[in-house]
Structures are given as structure tokens and as C-alpha cells.
Amino acid sequence: MDSSDDSGVIVQAVKPGFLFRSGGAPVIYREHFAPGSGNLEFLSCGEYELQPGAVMQPVAYPEEEALVYGWRGRAHAHLDGNRYELSEYDVLYIPKGRAWSLSNPGSETVRVWVTRAPAQNVHPVFYSQFAAVSKDESRIRHLKSRTVYMMFDVSEGADKLVAGYSFFDPYSRSWPPHNHTDQEEVYIFLKGRGSMEVYESPETLSFVREVNEGDAVTIPFYNYHPVFAQELPLVFIWCIAGARYWVGDKNKEFMKGTGEPITT
């Protein structure tokens, strides 16, 4: 609080300093990859971690659209004066150039994923709650031993992004293998443990990796990318950048879960 001396001159109160310990940041952003480091053309991916009570400074992506995914804890996303609750698996589309932020109103650490891709156009904000999508059969794709939830589908406005979640039963796998000539992807593993392959052809297959919670795998154009669940159910984000479709909606053979590898 300011005060004045006998001459009427305003004397500014001196404020105390604060000590911020190394490693004690209330908001942390981890950039997992950009297009160059992921061998991609479009996608970038990162993760926010907010301690209880933390508030993130607003950020904007001047040349990119983005999707924000609730993972651990319950966050609040703030955009255009509105507040959106991000519980587990909720998704929020951030239009190109729009400033947004996160806050953590709870007592536990919050973790939130973000994927981004270049955009030329500004599309409407879209908020997708998993509690609603998981009951909407128009947004669910049932396959053998796994279920896909279309959280941000082609019906929503965007330049490049489409995204959802895949839930695998224990000891199940992607089948048939498929690749894309006009899409790149990232898989972000949220729950369970499994493995994943990324390859151009079986003859050149060398990328075989175990995947755990918090791992992300990039899938450049033309690569097959099967996933294998192990003894636990497996949940992951799939985010596409490029032509806007989901493989099972474009090629119905994929939904049968049989046959030869599929290229779209």
C-alpha cells in the first residue's frame, strides 16, 4: 500500500522478494517433439504439468491450430473468457492464433497434453467431453478387442487435425496393419503397457519398442504402425495431421479386422 510524506509526495511501498527453488516451478511445459525432431511435416507435441493452485500464463500459436487433452487430474482451460473443465480424456480445440491458458483448482498435480499443426484458417472452438462421447454411438467405432472414440472428428472445423482415443483389451493388437499416404500421426500412451512397431515394409522392420504411460511415438507418412497391448488394458491418443478422415470410416475392410494390410 502506498503512502504520502509531509510534503504530499507519494511514497511507494517496498515489496519483498520471493525465492523460487530450482525444480519448484508451479507450471512446467515439456516439448516432446516438433516436426523436424519427429520426422514429420506438421505435428508438434508437448505436455503441461501444473501443481495445485498453479495458473499458466496465456499462450497462443500464431500459425497453428491445437488440441488439448485432459490426462491426469482435473484442469481448467481458459479461452475467450470461457472456462472449460478438462477431466480425464476431455478434449478442447484451440483455433489458430487464439490465446488460452490452464489452471489447476485441485489438490493434485495436473498433466495435460497438447498437439499442434500448421493452419491457415481460423475455426470455431470445440469442446469434447469424454463422458458424453463415450455414450454417443455415432462417435464410437467398435473393432475386435478394441474401441475407438472420435473426440475431434471430420464434422468439426479444422485445417489438418483429427483425434480420438483407442482403448485396447489386454493381449490385443491392431489388425490389419495400415498406413497412410496423406496423413501423419502421433500415438500418445496414457494407460497400460504395450509395444509398437513403425515400418515401411516387413522386410525393413526394425522399430519395435515397448511403450509405457507418457510415451509418444511419431508415425511419418507411409509407415505401418501396429500396437500391441500386453497384460493390461491400453489407452492412447491418436492424433492425425493431413487429410481429414479416420481409416475405418474411409476403408470398411479395416472394420472387419481381417485381410491384407490397408493403404489409404
Task: Specify the residue positions occupied by each region the protein language model found.
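Asparagine-centered strand-capping/turn motif at beta-strand->loop junctions
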Residues: 102-105, 228-229
